[in-house]
Amino acid sequence: MPEATPLLKVTGTKALGAEVILHGDNYDEAYAHALTYAQENGLTFIHPFEDPMVIAGQGTVALEMIDEIKDLDIVVVPIGGGGLISGMASAIKQIDPKIKIIGVNAAGAPAMHTSFYAKKAINSKSVRTIADGISVRDVSQPNLEHILECVDEVVTVDDEEIAAGILFLLERQKLVVEGAGAASVAAIMHRKFEFAKEAKIGAVLSGGNIDVQMLSVIIEKGLIKSHRKMKLVITLIDKPGSLMRLTDLFRNANANIIQIDYDRFSTKLSYGDAQITIILETKGKEHQAMIREMLNEAKYPFVEEV
């Protein structure tokens, strides 16, 4: 596995009895090392997305979806190496060619997207994305051929869009999904392809191995972007009662104080001033606008951090 593989994935694999070797900055470097290691130690190498049996096995996901959801219009599938979508698209197009197949690349690892529209393999120079499960630099030629034959469209989603998908699934569906798994939902949420309002769309959530620290960052940023948290840096006169008057303002605004830091020693401050960094729990865009207005009316100089 790459050295930056989430700890959850590493420990989970070890718990199943495997020896885990961490090598390289991305999948492709780990893959090259695995090939060498297998040759040097007389081991059998099973390719994670080019092995025909692996591809066929992943195609059964499509059979389950078609069995459970009648009259599917579109199926959206994350793409890393392309094994999952190759198997699924091959199965779907044999059963019902009318079903549209959409592949989703991470914008930070767009090799298959680039290759799909160029109709030839074009590797990425580098990859960087929170969706480590689809962070693949080099294109699989066999899978590209499957994709060109069976997939209707390939789109990309950036890390911000993937993070929004993770947060949506966590909050609305009560599902913990990794970046690679949330890419399909992100493509739907941000309308990366055309679809009718009444369309029946199936999205493949291909994994849940997300690092807890990464998840906490996504949640915190998501709360700020959805106007449910607000971070303010406020300058006030450093004298008894000043902080109480400021907190009274937030109480009157019905904003809950989550964290507060009081600094009177910063060299950027004038003598006699203090700087308050405060994080508030808020109830949306209009609530935050009201708080800004109240601070301006009370003549508190402030900067909002996002």
Annotated model-derived regions:
Residues S140-E198:
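Active-site-adjacent helical/loop segments in soluble small-molecule enzymes
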Residues E19, K98-K100, K200, N256:
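Residues at the starts of beta-strands that form the adenosine-phosphate
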Residues K200-S206, M230:
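Helical hairpin unit composed of two closely spaced alpha helices linked by a short loop
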Residues T13, I46, M65, V75-V76, ...:
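Buried hydrophobic positions in well-ordered alpha/beta secondary-structure cores of metabolic enzymes
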Residues M214-V306:
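A conserved regulatory-domain signal marking ACT and ACT-like small-molecule sensing domains
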Residues E50, G80-G83, N105-P110, I130, ...:
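Glycine-rich beta-alpha junction loops
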Residues P6-V10, I55, P78-A89, A109-H113, ...:
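Short glycine/serine/threonine-rich phosphate/pyrophosphate-binding segments
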Residues E3-I74, I92, N105-I162:
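Small/polar-residue-rich loop-to-helix segments that shape phosphate-bearing ligand pockets
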